[in-house]
Amino acid sequence: MQKKSLSDIAIQGKRVLMRVDFNVPLDSNKKITDDKRIIESLPSIKKVLENGGRLILMSHLGRPKGKVNADYSLAPVATRLAELLDCPVTMAKECIGTETMQQVLALQDGEVILLENLRFHPEEEANDPDFARELASLGEVYVNDAFGTAHRAHASTEGITHYVQTAVAGFLIERELLYLGKALQEPERPFVAILGGSKISGKIDVLENLFKKVDTVLIGGAMVFTFFKAQGYEIGNSLVEESKIELALKILDEAKNKGIKLLLPVDVIVAPEISATADCHSEMITAIPEEMIGVDIGPLTAEIYRNEILSARTVLWNGPMGVFEIDNFAAGTMAVAQAMAEATAEGATTIIGGGDSAAAVAKAGLANEMTHISTGGGASLEFLEGKELPGIAALND
């Protein structure tokens, strides 16, 4: 999927309206607890400022439900951005209106203003055309660099593109299209997908789409117990989606018919309860005790999965292998992260599909050892499901 990007347009002296994802976590004192998203948007921001553009940034933060709410002001972000850029960042009181327009028109080349939270207006999420038109009037060119909201047709991501001639991708979205897009369209083979998480229902569309592309699928997370139940194994008190047992059998059949190697764990870590203090040990999947809960893949499985990962040229990972937030139940997820890092070092393309997997890789301290970590949660998932993302479809080809 080729889209025009920030590198393809003239910026000098132009008002550049950029949608970024500054939806960062704040503590009770309105201090930013994780500025990763701000840092990720810096390459696009610096490109505009260094090339003499006049930058207007817009974002949402949290869920203020269409009302002005000071708890969700982007002011702390403006402060942090000014520190990171080492230059002043004007904070607008609003994202539309006469005063905002005057501030925008007063910008000089290489200056930047951050508009107030878009979601203070219900029209943003409703993709209201008048609101979109008013936003569009602030800039001469539009750049979308917010992959995390690209799966939503909102005024600032989709509606706005109807009122601008130039609508291009920022560097973050360009990277997502490059890595996620290439993996889905022309992966180097063998292509191994690792899918985890608690529910088959959450991953069924991803599985269906990946079955057209992959050579091998490794399954982990609590969704394995629905497969085991379907195969007639006892699973103790492990999480199971009773309504998805038929579906699990259908998936196993489909993999077989398509010649896809679909691997399930051979052993799992079990515990009497999901708590940080619970004792845990490994059991073969044929011998899960009645009162126990499966919480992670076992060491034998971790080794099998590691070998599969190391034999691949493209590896895509979405969803943890177990309850990795609890250290005692994190070994399987950490082993996969480690194997991915080793595969990267050996020249494979390794892609983390956002969300929990990204958190797991960060917890393992291996975030810099992957080819690409997607910045979108829901957006990455929908992309992997083969769905068109409105915020990306709307950009210039």
Curated annotation (Swiss-Prot):
Its BP terms in the Gene Ontology are:
gluconeogenesis; glycolytic process
Cross-referenced SUPFAM superfamilies, in alphabetical order? Phosphoglycerate kinase
Residues annotated as binding substrate: D21, F22, N23, R37, H60, L61, G62, R63, R119, R152
- Membrane as UniProt keyword: no
State the compartments where it is located: Cytoplasm
Which Enzyme Commission number(s) are on file for it? 2.7.2.3
For the keyword Transferase, the answer is yes
Q: Which UniProt keywords apply?
A: ATP-binding, Cytoplasm, Glycolysis, Kinase, Nucleotide-binding, Transferase
Q: In which pathway does it act?
A: Carbohydrate degradation; glycolysis; pyruvate from D-glyceraldehyde 3-phosphate: step 2/5
Q: Which top EC class is given?
A: transferase
Any GO CC annotation of this UniProt entry: cytosol
Please give one Gene Ontology molecular function term for this protein. ADP binding
Residues reported to bind ATP = K203, G294, E325, G354, G355, D356, S357
| InterPro entries in the cross-refs | Phosphoglycerate_kinase (IPR001576), Phosphoglycerate_kinase_CS (IPR015911), Phosphoglycerate_kinase_N (IPR015824), Phosphoglycerate_kinase_sf (IPR036043)
Q: Which reaction does it catalyse?
A: (2R)-3-phosphoglycerate + ATP = (2R)-3-phospho-glyceroyl phosphate + ADP
Question: What family does the entry list?
Answer: Belongs to the phosphoglycerate kinase family.
What subunit structure does UniProt give? Answer: Monomer.
Name of protein? Phosphoglycerate kinase
